[in-house]
Curated annotation (Swiss-Prot):
Protein's gene: PCMP-E101
Region Type E motif, annotated ranges: 475-545
Keywords: Repeat
GO molecular function terms listed in the Swiss-Prot or TrEMBL record: RNA binding
Stored NCBIfam families: PPR
Protein name: Pentatricopeptide repeat-containing protein At4g18840
UniProt record, GO biological process: RNA modification
PPR repeat residue intervals: 104-138, 139-173, 174-204, 205-239, 240-266, 267-301, 303-337, 338-368, 369-403, 404-434, 440-474
Protein family (similarity comment): Belongs to the PPR family. PCMP-E subfamily.
Length: 545
């Protein structure tokens, strides 16, 4: 009966959409006796927790019932929290670890491993130091995980010190530790040391060789990687995939294809690597060929990465029929359209001229991310549907998504297409004041172009003055064009002079001013401009009417 009550209360905690913590109090948890079987239900729920909030609620439950004082239960809570990839959740797992009276090695290792796989791997060293100061000395897993963290941030010095500590610890040499050491030294650029560690290993496996192989390729040392690949005593499919990806990154598609064709066994990563190789150099027809061959000859099924790459190729080629076939394939195999896949589908239909279909896919996508919103906003803008793009932007904000720099390029371009100057001004101001997005040259370019088209030359000049001089030239050229359209010769002279100050040998200022003077019949100015160009040795042919 006690276990049933605990199970019910765990259900209340883990399902906040149906219950809340106030209902917990009504269950009189304080009156419940905690037996040896009590941790099982709450821990099974904790293992299924998918968010920081749910883990925090499970933690609160354990504190309230006294389960947190049980080392096994507390350690399991930390381990479950540490498996969540969210940085805040890993940090929370660390905070729980620091509150456990006598944490064991498993608990420390869970947090060290979590940080090693996170965006802040250097924090793993902090946990490792805390472990050294405690009663439990690191084991071989502790060393493996903390060395993996050093490899992640190329911490050569830290890795060297931990290597020394491992030797002094008297722990039996372990292939996992030594593989990680090879990776630490290799990723830090110390290839000679990495090779020495590899050569001294009493037992080497494919992972040992791959640790150095991947380090070479990460640094762009393709020739050295190939020499090592040819020397390898043992290869696995990952070894071949590394070489294909390395050649692809270097733009060596022919070499990548040779390795791909020589593979004894391929997995989905192999096919994706070959697709990426062709996409990287713009060979989109070949992307589709590899995809079709994968469907015909391979037991491997395309994954989300494959489909995104193929849809991007269809978009670049304008191949609507192939893109539609991929869409049918996705639906037929029950693949959920979300995130990058949704974005790729929206972009494909838009670039193939089917903006209505792009909007339909967007509306049907239940799990959107910022990239999906950005894609449809940009696509609507390109198709001249500026007002629709701004309506989508309003929906995006209303649904709680935070716009980024790409979002604002899309909405400012939309304003530009429909001539909505006041709305553009408001959005440009909101970028930094509300959404903390600093404007870049692209955002300034949208505003300067719109202001120029509306004849607001002086306001546009003020914006250009906020930009670093080395980026201002292209916007000043745009303004010169606007001056020509509106016949504003005085402003044009001022802008041209500034353009020439930035780059005396750039002929664009002379050329546009010569055209302006010619259109105004001021031929003496045209002649003076040509003389100045010769004086500055600017080679530019001018067509003067």
């Amino acid at each position: 009966m006690v276990e049933k009550d605990i199970y019910m209360c765990a259900e209340i905690i883990i399902r906040p959409q149906a219950y809340n913590l106030r209902l917990l109090q009504k269950e009189n948890l304080k009156k419940m006796s905690v037996c040896s079987s009590t941790p099982v239900p709450i821990l099974s729920f904790t293992e299924r927790a998918k968010s920081l909030t749910e883990i925090q609620q499970a933690h609160a439950f354990m504190l309230k019932t006294g389960l947190f004082h049980d080392t096994f239960s507390a350690s399991k809570l930390v381990a479950f929290a540490a498996t969540n990839p969210e940085p805040k959740t890993v940090s929370y797992a660390h905070s729980i670890l620091n509150r456990i009276g006598s944490p064991n090695g498993f608990t420390h290792n869970s947090v060290i491993r979590a940080y090693a796989n996170s965006s802040t791997p250097e924090v793993a060293l902090t946990v490792f130091r805390e472990m050294l100061l405690g009663p439990v000395f690191p084991d071989k897993y502790s060393f493996t995980f903390v060395l993996k963290a050093c490899a992640a941030f190329c911490g050569f010095e830290e890795g060297r010190q931990i290597h020394g500590l491992f030797i002094k610890s008297g722990l039996v040499t372990d292939v996992f530790v030594e593989n990680t050491l090879v990776n630490v030294y290799g990723r830090s650029g110390y290839f000679e040391i990495a090779r020495k560690v590899l050569d001294r290993m009493p037992v080497r496996d494919a992972v040992s060789w791959n640790s150095l192989l991947s380090a070479y390729l990460e640094k762009g040392l393709v020739d050295e990687a190939r020499a090592l690949f040819d020397e390898m005593e043992e290869r696995n499919v990952e070894s071949w995939n590394f070489m294909i990806s390395g050649y692809a990154a270097a733009g060596l598609v022919k070499e990548a294809k040779e390795v791909f064709d020589s593979m004894p066994v391929r997995d989905v990563v192999s096919w994706n690597a070959m697709v990426t190789a062709y996409a990287h150099v713009g060979c989109y027809n070949e992307v589709l060929e590899v995809f079709n061959k994968m469907l015909d000859d391979s037991t491997e099924k395309p994954d989300g990465f494959t489909l995104v790459s193929v849809l991007s190729a269809c978009a670049s080629l304008g191949s609507l029929s192939q893109g539609e076939w991929v869409h049918v394939y996705i639906d037929k195999h029950g693949i959920e359209i979300e995130g990058f896949l949704a974005t790729a589908l929206v972009d494909m239909y838009s670039k193939c001229g089917k903006i209505d279909k792009a909007l339909e896919v967007f509306r049907a996508t239940s799990k959107r991310d910022v990239s999906t919103w950005n894609s449809i906003i940009s696509d609507l803008s390109v198709h001249g549907l500026g007002k629709d793009a701004l309506e989508i932007f309003s929906e995006m904000v209303y649904e709680g998504f935070k716009p980024n720099g790409i979002t604002f390029i899309g909405v400012l371009s939309a304003c530009n297409h429909v001539g909505m100057l006041d709305q553009a001004r408001k959005l440009f101001e909101m970028m930094s004041s509300v959404y903390r997005v600093e404007p870049t040259i692209e955002h300034y370019g949208c505003m300067v172009d719109l202001l120029g088209r509306m004849g607001k030359i002086e306001e546009a000049e003020e914006l250009v003055n906020e930009i670093p001089a080395d980026e201002a030239s292209i916007l000043l050229e745009s303004l010169l064009g606007a001056c020509k359209r509106f016949g504003q010769l005085e402003q044009a002279e001022r802008i041209a002079n500034r353009l020439l100050e930035l780059n005396l040998r750039d002929s664009s200022g002379y050329a546009q001013m010569s055209n302006l003077y010619a259109s105004d019949g001021r031929w003496e100015k045209v002649i003076d401009g040509r003389r100045n160009m010769r004086a500055e040795r600017v080679n530019r042919s001018l067509d003067v009417a």
